[in-house]
Amino acid sequence: MPFTSEIISIILLAIGLSMDGFSVSLGLGMQQLRLKRIAYIGLTIGFLHMLMPLAGMLLGQVISEQIGQWTSFAGGVLLFLIGAHMFFSAFRLTEGFRWQPVGVGLWIIAFSVSLDSFTVGLGLGISGVQIFVTLFAFGIVSCFLTWLGMLIGRKVYRFLGVYSELLGGSILCGFGIFILFS
């Protein structure tokens, strides 16, 4: 994949992965958090959106040496399945328990919205993507979208909440299909 199209794909993937954090931050924004707390939450989520896929990529590279030619196919299928899960989970009828974004609760929130980044990192590690560029994009985009979500969350959570998860899942599915057929 040429470098420019890889960058565009990585940015789109970063946006897709960050939609979980964006959705959660829309809800957190309704708690009237101070700007300092909003900044800290965004940085924490951005950090874990870099750390989790790094762990997945490293494991994915080890696995790719073992399974050879099937690596791109496996990575594409994995990304598609994650996106499909994210897309369909947007249709849940019940609202789950929400942790408060302080101390351990903040790390649990950040970990839960970053967990899908680990499995995406696994798929990307198998496909041999540029690690530094990918991690940087994941961290920056997730941090920015978390901040943005908290700042606008007070006014539009009920309108965008479900749609942001649908969009994120669609982007992941599309990226998985792109890898499968390229």
Curated annotation (Swiss-Prot):
The keyword Mitochondrion does not apply. It comes from the Bacteria. GO terms for molecular function: manganese ion transmembrane transporter activity. Its main location: membrane. The chain crosses the membrane at residues 7-27, 38-58, 71-91, 106-126, 131-151, 159-179. InterPro entries: Mntp/YtaF, Put_MntP. It is a multi-pass membrane protein. It is found in: Cell membrane. Keywords: Cell membrane, Ion transport, Manganese, Membrane, Transmembrane, Transmembrane helix, Transport. One of its GO terms (cellular component) is plasma membrane. PANTHER family: MANGANESE EFFLUX PUMP MNTP-RELATED. Belongs to the MntP (TC 9.B.29) family. Probably functions as a manganese efflux pump. This is Putative manganese efflux pump MntP. It comes from Oceanobacillus iheyensis (strain DSM 14371 / CIP 107618 / JCM 11309 / KCTC 3954 / HTE831).
